Swiss-Prot record:
EC numbers: 2.3.1.57
Active site residues according to the UniProt entry: Y140 (proton donor)
Record organism: Mesocricetus auratus
Assembly and binders: Homodimer.
Cellular component, GO annotation: cytosol
SUPFAM superfamilies, per the entry: Acyl-CoA N-acyltransferases (Nat)
InterPro entries named among the record's database cross-references: Acyl_CoA_acyltransferase, Diverse_Substrate_AcTransf, GNAT_dom
PANTHER family: DIAMINE ACETYLTRANSFERASE 1, DIAMINE N-ACETYLTRANSFERASE
Identification of the protein by name: Diamine acetyltransferase 1
Length: 171
């Protein structure tokens, strides 16, 4: 399959974006963790101040999924800032449906993300990969990605909403 196109997502793509987010979560054995709704995606990504940006991979009708979907991959990203190195593109989610892997779709999405990062003068692109996800780790390593966990010893932490609320209310 040589025909596909990568394009910025539009508000009308939110149902497909949510579908792919759920497919990625299932692939990562975390499908019960997805709490977002289509409305959240619409408001958060396509309002006056978008919190994220998204590229999607779309195939022509002759290559649609058996369920009739034309959108077969996506990359959700946003910009952040590192006080040591400046602007970063943070790749939050990146997924291509399994039947559409091996056709260059993921590589083309990553190329488009790289172009966005360079256009915005970002110093690098950061992302997380599950330790068990060897196919993705190898995909990124083939493209010169560095594993900061092993190379620099960084650890990722989070503070859940309930504790944020407690801290915010402290006097």
């Amino acid at each position: 399959m040589a025909k596909f196109k990568i394009r910025p997502a539009t508000a009308s793509d939110c149902s497909d974006i949510l579908r792919l987010i759920k497919e990625l979560a299932k692939y990562e054995y975390m499908e019960d963790q997805v709490m977002l709704t289509e409305k959240d995606l619409l408001e958060d990504g396509f309002g006056e101040h978008p919190f994220y940006h998204c590229l999607i991979a779309e195939v022509p009708k002759e290559h649609w999924t058996p369920e009739g979907h034309s959108i077969v991959g996506f990359a959700m990203y946003y910009f952040t800032y590192d006080p040591w190195i400046g602007k970063l593109l943070y790749l939050e989610d990146f997924f291509v449906m399994s039947d559409y892997r091996g056709f260059g779709i993921g590589s083309e999405i990553l190329k488009n993300l790289s172009q966005v990062a360079m256009k915005c003068r970002c110093s690098s692109m950061h992302f997380l990969v599950a330790e068990w996800n060897e196919p993705s780790i190898n995909f990124y390593k083939r493209r010169a990605a560095s594993d900061l966990s092993s190379e620099e010893g960084w650890r990722l932490f989070k503070i859940d909403k309930e504790y944020l609320l407690k801290m915010a209310a402290e006097e």
